[in-house]
Amino acid sequence: DAIKNDYPELRIIIASPQGITFNHNKAVELSREERRLVFLCGHYEGIDERVRLGFGAEEISIGDYILTGGELPAMVIIDAAVRLIPGVLGDEDSARHDSFADFILDYPQYTRPPDYKGMNVPEVLLSGNHEEIRKWRRMQAIKNTYYKRPDLLEKMKLTDEDKKILNEVKKKA
């Protein structure tokens, strides 16, 4: 009761396998929350039901598996939300272009050297042609999503270019 009296504008979240499944949209919602967020983390047996009911806490799950406590799920939720707050990341474009920001997986990443044990960086990435690099990256991202997480394609807002790419990927499948 003291907490409710001192901080009436709290949003209380319990990391729980009984909650709604956490996703990028929930991270965006939490990143824009103006109230203070409080995460309650049970350990082994969870949290007394009266706490959930008394505080009107919402439950959020990070997946269908069991951990020893709610600390790790709370950290996952916090990290995913905080990185979306302007000014937190050094590069504002990072959060916008990461996987799931628009329901598409990322394209493959390459670093130096250009040849590692016979595995080469794709020529297009070494070409310096920014438009071709952009097209290659988009093609690879759509291809990754199609093969690894096709469920995300249903949520994606496909441009005309994306639709053409997806059709090409499907033909080659």
Residue positions per predicted region:
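S-adenosyl-L-methionine/SAH cofactor-binding core of RNA-modifying enzymes
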Residues: 1-43
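Alpha-helical scaffold segments in soluble metabolic enzymes
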Residues: 2, 76, 80, 135
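Short, well-ordered secondary-structure micro-motifs
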Residues: 24-26, 50-52, 108
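Short glycine/serine/threonine-biased micro-segments
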Residues: 40, 44, 61, 85, ...
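Structured adenosyl-cofactor binding patch, chiefly the S-adenosyl-L-methionine
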Residues: 47, 51-98
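Internal, active-site/partner-interface "lid" segment
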Residues: 72, 84-123
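SAM-dependent methyltransferases
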Residues: 114-173
